[in-house]
Amino acid sequence: MDHVTQYPVIVDTHRHPMGPRMQAKMAERGLYDPKQGFPQTNAQDLICYRECFDLDYAMPKQREGGVTLSLITNGGEVDWIARDLLQVSTGEALKFLNDEYREISDRYPGEFALTANAHALEEGCRPIVEEMIKGGAKAIAVASSYGDGADRAFLDSPKAEWLWEFAEANDIVVHIHPPMQSIGHESLMQYRLNEAVGRPFDSTVNGARMIASGVFDRHPKLQVLIVHMGGGLASIVGRLEFNWRLNYNGIKNPPADKPYTNKRSPFDYFKTNILVDSMGFSAIGVRAAIELCGVDRVVFGSDFGPVPYGIKEQVQSVEEVLPSVADREWVFWKTSNRIFRLGLSDTGFISAPALPVAA
């Protein structure tokens, strides 16, 4: 179905634009050759598309897709950017990223909103996060996990408590994106499975651990946004439910740190604490996300740039699932406007001649 319906506002909560300084660093590290055309790749299987590297080329496509405002996030890559790309401290990397994104925002006024990128397990970055929030950042962006192998740590780590305390106290949403190298990546480097399967799996494991460890019971007002439709959480939340109910009941001296500590059904937290985005090229996935979280807890996300197409297709996925224009507006902008305090006005709905939308 050709996309013919226009909306006055669509907020894309999942964008990773790249500015000239980041491009220069990638070229310096041999990850990108500015003399070659696009697409191109490298030994790390990082595929570079023009839509990610050339904003003057990408922005008309963003507008044609109907997006009017995008959140800039890169919390999933902070660790990699600091350690491998820039080879500097986390604090220096955050300042680099934040300066880069301010330049992008200034270059395209009114089309980007900033987030405060952070390392969830390093409380030392808190002053930078506080400064960004005071400067207008709309959320805190972090990775779903850090490290690798047996040393990989998720956001149920005690080291993340500073983040939850700060976010809850300041009513700031935490945007959670998987890292470049996901859990199990060593078995997923064929067929781009690290990207297709590994990263959503990383989000799934992290979301399950946050629920089971009682993060949302300790911080009942905390709001987190898990990208890629929440990974596979909609498919496995029932399994979390029965394992939570069984737990280690009847087991004498249960092993330390293994029993569930959450006080409510795992399903409940999707109605009160967890939001997800619509990125995934699947109406089935959008429908599952809405059934799990509610229509007012799913926000639009495209991942456009690193994924060099698909804004229109992902708008259509929402349209296919939600025949009601009023319901679509929750996904396209109203929920984002509320949770990120974007200050957008309700300008109504503009309709061009449209084909019927499947129920």
Which stretches of residues belong to each language-model region?
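Short glycine-enriched loops at secondary-structure junctions
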Residues: 75-76, 120, 178-183, 304-306
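Acidic-and-aromatic substrate-binding clefts and catalytic sites of carbohydrate-active enzymes
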Residues: 47-53, 119-125, 148-158, 277-283, ...
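Mid-to-C-terminal alpha-helical segments outside catalytic/metal-binding sites
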Residues: 1-13, 19-69, 99-106, 130, ...
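Short aromatic-enriched loop/helix-cap "lid" or pocket-rim segments at secondary-structure transitions
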Residues: 21-26, 83-85, 128, 186-189, ...
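Catalytic pocket-lining loop regions of alpha/beta-barrel enzymes
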Residues: 137-299, 350-359
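Short, well-structured secondary-structure segments
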Residues: 45, 49, 58-62, 66-93, ...
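Alpha-helix-loop-beta-strand connector modules within alpha/beta enzyme cores
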Residues: 93-111, 161-176
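Extended, non-globular alpha-helical segments
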Residues: 124-137
